[in-house]
Regions:
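Amphipathic alpha-helical dimer-interface segment in Rossmann-like NAD(P)H-dependent oxidoreductases
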Residues: 101, 123-147, 159, 183-184
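Short-chain dehydrogenase/reductase
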Residues: 2-90, 104-112
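Catalytic Tyr-X3-Lys loop
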Residues: 94, 114-134, 152, 175
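Active-site loop of short-chain dehydrogenase/reductase
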Residues: 7-8, 64-65, 92-93, 143-157, ...
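Structural signature of the Rossmann-like NAD(P)-dependent dehydrogenase/reductase core
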Residues: 12-13, 98-101, 128, 149-156, ...
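Catalytic loop of short-chain dehydrogenase/reductase
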Residues: 102-106, 114-118, 149-188, 199-201, ...
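C-terminal helical subdomain
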Residues: 195, 212-289
């Protein structure tokens, strides 16, 4: 679990709960020191529970070292300070997981976008899309210095089909394109950038949906645990040939099969390609500088 006698280091943004929390804990189980960011420090601040301190403790309990850092990803100075701290305390960065997203409940209503609060769209583009660029910007020099670094964007099929309106679609499509274009800049330095499509994930919100009616029980059968993608990310980081997939949007369930990773109770979650007949966009290989 070490590399050159140094613990491997990851930063996971948006890790108070949900997918980010699961990814951070999974990386901890692989021996990573994980800096986990979020805004929630006190129990009860969010109706969905969870704090960055709780996540950090779970990372440590899983076998890694959890470091909670309160970061508002709308504040670029706080993001810059995060990576300055990682440099000072660790001297390296192996993985950045861009997961932070500010999703209002109103965004998921069936109304047309103009009948939803404007903040529901703008906030997601700020903390979700823009925040991924800013975090990658400040992480890049440290990743390049470390060598063989990995940048991950957590994404979803909403990148290529309608879901929750144009802001959500632009968010997911933008993350996938971030991975594609950052890969071009990172390639000479051996750093990999990928986007990973998640399936249905057993987050706090999804569990509430499943519990709301027996007809929704099928979701539990196909859902991924929040930790599932974290194990996929750890496998990617350990793969000596990972640069071959740099720039791609990966379907997490398919990558898991390739690496022999199963989820709870030995399950193999279905690919969204199978569930929804969707696949990531294909980008032209032309590079213009």
């Amino acid at each position: 679990m070490t590399d050159g006698q140094q613990a491997r280091v990851a930063v996971v943004t948006g890790g108070s709960r949900g997918v980010g929390r699961g990814i951070a804990i999974a990386l901890g189980s692989h021996g990573y020191t994980v800096y986990v960011t979020g805004r929630t420090r006190t129990t009860g601040e969010s109706p969905w529970g969870g704090t960055i301190g709780d996540t950090a403790a779970a990372i440590t309990a899983a076998g890694g070292k959890g470091v909670p850092v309160r970061v508002d990803h709308r504040n670029d100075e706080e993001v810059a300070a995060l990576f300055a701290r990682v440099r000072d305390e660790e001297g390296r960065l192996d993985i950045l997981v861009n997961n932070a997203a500010l999703i209002h409940d109103e965004l998921q209503s069936p109304l047309p976008f103009w009948d939803k609060p404007l903040a529901a769209s703008v906030d997601l583009l700020d903390v979700g899309l823009r925040s991924g660029l800013v975090a990658s910007y400040y992480a890049a020099p440290l990743l390049v210095e470390t060598g063989r670094g990995l940048v991950v964007f957590t994404s979803a099929p909403g990148a290529v089909h309608y879901q929750y309106g144009p802001a959500y679609g632009a968010h997911k499509a933008g993350l996938d394109k971030f991975a594609a274009d950052m890969a071009v800049d990172f390639r000479p330095f051996g750093v990999t950038a990928v986007s990973i499509w998640l399936g249905v994930v057993l987050t706090e919100r999804v569990k509430q949906i499943i519990d709301s009616g027996p007809e929704l029980g099928y979701l539990d059968d196909i859902a991924e645990t929040p930790e599932f993608t974290g194990h996929v990310i750890a496998a990617l980081a350990a793969d000596p040939d990972v640069l071959a997939v740099s720039g791609r949007t990966l379907i997490g369930a398919e990558a898991a099969r390739q690496y022999g990773i199963s989820d709870r109770d030995g399950r193999h979650p279905p690919s969204v390609r199978e569930l929804m007949s969707v696949q990531p966009a294909t980008y032209h290989g032309r590079i213009r500088r």
